[in-house]
Amino acid sequence: MKVNLRNRSVFGFVIPDMVKGPWADIASGIRQTAQRDGHGVCVPLCWDNPAAVLRHPSVFARLCAEAGIDGVFLRAFPDRKDTRRVLSALRREKIPVALLRVNDESPICGAGFDVVTLRSEGRVLSRVALRLGSVACHALLQRLAKPRNPPADLVLE
């Protein structure tokens, strides 16, 4: 069963600590902005169990493709190898990925991936996370809808 809606995109999240804390606020900001501005809908993928994605990244990517997911917002996993495996699996299925990170955590080098850096100082992150999510959504939904060659890093301050 496909989840695509007419003339709207469907985006997925894979964010390990999305249930609470600043990342939950960032995800909420992206979701609210996407729905409010008519870009599309955002759905959590493996909300409570990101380890399932790591166990079978190619199966996860295939399921995303079959479900009609148009793009994925991914927070880097603690182990860079795990992040690369998931990125590569999604790329094989031709699903655009936006890799989210705060400041300089988990730097990933990989041609063809959009890396979005959300700049913030310490505790400020939890207060401005919703706004950062909103700004990230505007920038990323445009880039996921119309990929540029080559993708470049986007820094939001």
Where are these regions (language model features)?
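Flexible loop/turn connectors
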Residues: C109-E157
